[in-house]
Regions:
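C-terminal binding/interaction regions
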Residues: 1-26, 30, 36, 87-149
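Structured beta-strand/loop patches that form or line metal/cofactor-binding pockets in enzymes
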Residues: 22-67
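Alpha-helical support elements that line or immediately flank enzyme active sites
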Residues: 76-88
């Protein structure tokens, strides 16, 4: 049984629709020092680029995304960009891991997930899991690549 924090269906919808209709992190980054990757879905319209910049302190300084995506992918990717800023690489990877556990209906730590808890019932709709994880997975790859640089 998944661990969860109680959010009403209305609250979950409101969080998702807020980030879909007014994404805060959807833009091309300005300045230097960003790494990026492209991710697309064969089953949905999702076709995005994600951008990550690590600070000198080893924490995520900035995270953005740009492109075309469905409501689930847009909201989820926008939320993860918010959540990653200020996290160390280890904290960020832990966050990504907990989100993945949650989406697959496994035990997870809800503490770091914040607004991403709006996706806690996604495991009941397996066809939407990829939409919810496309941005998270891409940012996770960038974090892992940064670690090996």
């Amino acid at each position: 049984m998944p661990t969860s924090i109680e959010l009403s269906p209305e609250m979950m919808r409101a969080i998702i629709m807020d980030h879909y209709s007014s994404p805060r992190n959807k833009r091309q980054p300005e300045g230097e020092g960003f790494v990026s990757t492209h991710s697309a879905s064969v089953n949905c319209i999702d076709n995005i680029d994600v951008f990550l910049k690590m600070g000198d302190d080893g924490k995520v300084a900035e995270a953005y995304w740009d492109g075309v995506a469905c409501a689930i992918s847009t909201a989820s990717t926008d939320i993860v960009c918010d959540l990653l800023v200020g996290k160390t690489e280890a904290e960020a990877l832990y966050l990504l891991e907990q989100f993945t556990h949650m989406l697959h209906g496994e035990e997870y730590d809800p503490e770091p997930l914040d607004e991403a808890l709006a996706f806690q019932n996604t495991y009941r709709q397996p066809n939407r899991i990829h939409c919810a994880t496309i941005g998270w997975d891409a940012l996770g790859e960038l974090l892992k690549e940064h670690h090996h640089d």
